[in-house]
């Protein structure tokens, strides 16, 4: 059982490293960072508490929103999805990501108080 799991993981890593464009790898690293940051915030909330509740919610909403926006960007700039997003260039997708991210963080900063 464990040998097949190791085989699947190693094959996945080989294919990911060989066939994924560098832009997507960079975006995946950003997604991993956001995921770990959100998990760390949630763990802190469970262990220590949520005394400044608005601050916790703002940080966590920022992580979740940023993750969703980055996943949308990844989907749009993936070369395999080019047929689905014919009218949207990677530069336009990135500009949309920056605009939406700016709006998200303005809302988050407003929520902090």
Swiss-Prot record:
It comes from the Eukaryota. GO terms for molecular function: enzyme activator activity. Pathway: Protein modification; protein glycosylation. It is found in: Endoplasmic reticulum membrane. The modification N-acetylserine is found at residue 2. GO terms for biological process: apoptotic process; blastocyst development; negative regulation of apoptotic process; protein glycosylation; protein N-linked glycosylation; protein N-linked glycosylation via asparagine; regulation of protein stability. Residues 2-30, 74-92 are cytoplasmic. InterPro entries: DAD/Ost2. GO terms for cellular component: endoplasmic reticulum membrane; membrane; oligosaccharyltransferase complex; oligosaccharyltransferase complex A; oligosaccharyltransferase complex B. Keywords: Acetylation, Apoptosis, Endoplasmic reticulum, Membrane, Transmembrane, Transmembrane helix. Its main location: endoplasmic reticulum. The chain crosses the membrane at residues 31-51, 53-73, 93-113. It is a multi-pass membrane protein. Residues 52 are lumenal. Component of the oligosaccharyltransferase (OST) complex. OST exists in two different complex forms which contain common core subunits RPN1, RPN2, OST48, OST4, DAD1 and TMEM258, either STT3A or STT3B as catalytic subunits, and form-specific accessory subunits. STT3A complex assembly occurs through the formation of 3 subcomplexes. Subcomplex 1 contains RPN1 and TMEM258, subcomplex 2 contains the STT3A-specific subunits STT3A, DC2/OSTC, and KCP2 as well as the core subunit OST4, and subcomplex 3 contains RPN2, DAD1, and OST48. Belongs to the DAD/OST2 family. Subunit of the oligosaccharyl transferase (OST) complex that catalyzes the initial transfer of a defined glycan (Glc(3)Man(9)GlcNAc(2) in eukaryotes) from the lipid carrier dolichol-pyrophosphate to an asparagine residue within an Asn-X-Ser/Thr consensus motif in nascent polypeptide chains, the first step in protein N-glycosylation. N-glycosylation occurs cotranslationally and the complex associates with the Sec61 complex at the channel-forming translocon complex that mediates protein translocation across the endoplasmic reticulum (ER). All subunits are required for a maximal enzyme activity. This is Dolichyl-diphosphooligosaccharide--protein glycosyltransferase subunit DAD1. It comes from Homo sapiens (Human). The lineage of its organism: Eukaryota, Metazoa, Chordata, Craniata, Vertebrata.
